[in-house]
A protein has these predicted regions:
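Short coil/turn connectors at secondary-structure junctions
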Residues: 1-4, 28-29, 79-81, 117-119, ...
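Short glycine/threonine-rich loop-to-helix capping motif typified by GTGT followed
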Residues: 93-104, 134-142, 148, 158, ...
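Short beta-strand segments
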Residues: 6-10, 86, 145-147, 182
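Flexible glycine-/small-residue-enriched beta->alpha junction loops
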Residues: 1-53
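Glycine-rich phosphate/diphosphate-binding loop of Rossmann-like nucleotide-binding domains
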Residues: 31-125
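Flexible, glycine/charged-enriched surface loops at secondary-structure junctions
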Residues: 79-87, 111-124, 220-232, 242-254
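Glycine-rich phosphate/nucleotide-binding loop
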Residues: 134-234, 241-242
Length: 259
């Protein structure tokens, strides 16, 4: 890749709020929804077990999916980059199909003209097609993922660039007006304990620097402080140029090799 890639992860629901359990033996698994308004319940037979197995029920809500769509589209507008949503709606016709339909509705009613004015696009793709395309493209796009897909693909993309170190992590509200910026890799306790023991360490500081620069950039955006935004962009560019110039920590150096 020659340009950055943004993974938009819908950090709500699906496997991360699922109810899973062991099936002890033969029997029938049912899924049932009981409306609060007194209407008839909706019930589906999930499986007839002939012996022990496993089961899981997961969910999501329209309000959260719509909010995620708005956040992704706003992020794309900020960067002037196209936005892609990946699902497996050919298999999960109702579940993933809902993501696809709600994204399209939000785009058509709230963002279509804004994207057209900036000459950028939105498109839904099957997850397997999107993964293959991402491997071939040069970067420069926002990839909207369901919760589990975003968890996995963010690490794939990070390692594709060489390390989690130069990666930024930004949480954005649907309206784009509240931001939390953090280091993507969390803390480096293991490195610090080694340092306390007097051992040599090589810790990449760039994610921590970028956590501040992203926060400052958005502060500048909200305050219409162009100088602060320019400072943030220049500091990030200097960090990238430093790495590309050959000054880097051990993790990246091992991947670059003699190049």
């Amino acid at each position: 890749w020659t340009k950055p890639i943004v993974i938009g992860r819908h950090a709500y629901g699906d496997q991360y709020r699922a109810t899973d359990f062991l099936i002890p033996g033969s029997g029938k698994l049912l899924m049932k929804f009981i409306p609060d308004n007194g209407e008839d319940a909706i019930e589906h037979e999930v499986n007839q077990y002939d012996g022990p197995g496993i089961a899981m029920g997961m969910y999501n809500i329209d309000e959260s999916i719509r909010g995620f769509a708005r956040a992704c589209f706003n992020y794309g507008l900020n960067l002037n980059w196209p936005v892609y949503l990946s699902t497996k709606n050919t298999i999960l016709k109702a579940y993933d199909g809902r993501f696809k339909d709600l994204f399209q509705d939000i785009f058509d009613t709230e963002f279509k003209d804004k994207f057209k004015n900036k000459n950028i696009t939105y498109e839904h793709r099957l997850i397997d097609d999107m993964v293959a395309a991402a491997m071939k493209w040069e970067g420069g796009f926002v990839w909207a993922c369901k919760n589990y897909d975003g968890d996995v693909q963010s690490d794939v993309v990070a390692q594709g660039f060489g390390s989690l170190g130069p990666m930024t992590s930004v949480l954005m509200t649907p309206d784009g007006n509240t931001i939390e910026s953090e280091a993507a890799h969390g803390t480096v306790t293991r490195h610090y304990r080694a340092y306390e023991r007097g051992e040599a360490t090589s810790t990449n500081p760039i994610a921590s620097i970028f956590a501040w620069t992203r926060g400052l950039w958005y502060r500048g955006k909200f305050d219409k402080n162009i100088e602060l935004q320019n400072f943030s962009e220049k500091l990030e560019k200097v960090c990238i140029n430093t790495i590309e110039g050959g000054a880097m920590t051990k993790g990246l150096a091992l991947r670059v090799g003699n190049n």
